[in-house]
Amino acid sequence: MKSTFFIDGRPVGLGQPCYVIAEAGVNHNCDLALGKRLIETAQASGADAIKFQSYEAGKIVTRVAPRYWVEAQDPRGTQWDTFDRLDKLSAEDFRALLAHARKVGLTAFSTPFDDDAVDILAALDVPAFKIASADLTTTPLVEHAARVGRPMILSTGTCTLGEVEEALEACRRVGNEEVVLLHCTLKYPCPPEGINLRMMEHLMRAFPGVPVGLSDHSLGVAVPTAAVALGACMIEKHYTVDKTLLGSPDHHLSADPAEMRALVDSIRTVERALGKAEKGVEPLERKAFLYARRSVTSAVAIPRGTTIERKMLTYKRPGTGINPRFLDLVVGRVARVDIPVDTTITWEMV
């Protein structure tokens, strides 16, 4: 598998800036104008991409399949009720959304939930495919999407390590080596104790060289920011223009534009702070190096020719003289010059 590749011209993977996806899902509420607002505000918030979901209710769920989430606006409904309410955007609608994203300078793609959706998105020339956690073991769908030859983003919620390996192998079988694995806990919203960020490190060890990130279902920006500090190369966060909207059940648990902006800013701050694993004096520390450290200092006046004794010495700031770790080497030397009391001692003096 490749450790670095490109999505719509942007490098993604190991050693690259974290790729931030605003996961709009179906928060467009089947309203094209709202979909365009999602795109515009995501771009203004600093996200690298926006992602939607492409499905038809009848192709992914039976009419009686119970929900695994709570939906206040329809508490007794089934999965089919939700999906059927939110699957009304046509291929032409998606074409319009992708065109609008290109117009405002934001990468856009979608999660296909069936082979027909893959084909439609491929025809629309999306730059990547995302496979949802629940479909990682739907191997025919994974292979069908991977065969298109675009980068694959695989969420791993509910999956065993063996199932993740099988999904990677499915991509390899059809010649797709451009894959990102996203750690995920399939719970909406997910409390911090359920996130298990260290699983990202486990995925990195299990599949060396494969880029790893986080599909985040927590509230706020703390968890995804911490994920970047642990090495996440991609963050996906649910996104809405307004948490109070009805329609999609995801609005209330999604980041709004202010939160997305805060998340992107926090991630970029962490990236700058991570720096490099080389210990030494940083350029920003140069003044502190000179003036916050201490030097061997005369505790009394030391006339020229005097053999220096320990009681004649102390150590004080600044650090422009002999480092205190060499104090014992100064003891027993002869003063070459008159050294006034409270003087920073240099090697030229002794």
Tell me the role of every PLM-derived stretch.
Residues 1-350:
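Catalytic cores and adjacent flexible loops of soluble metabolic enzymes
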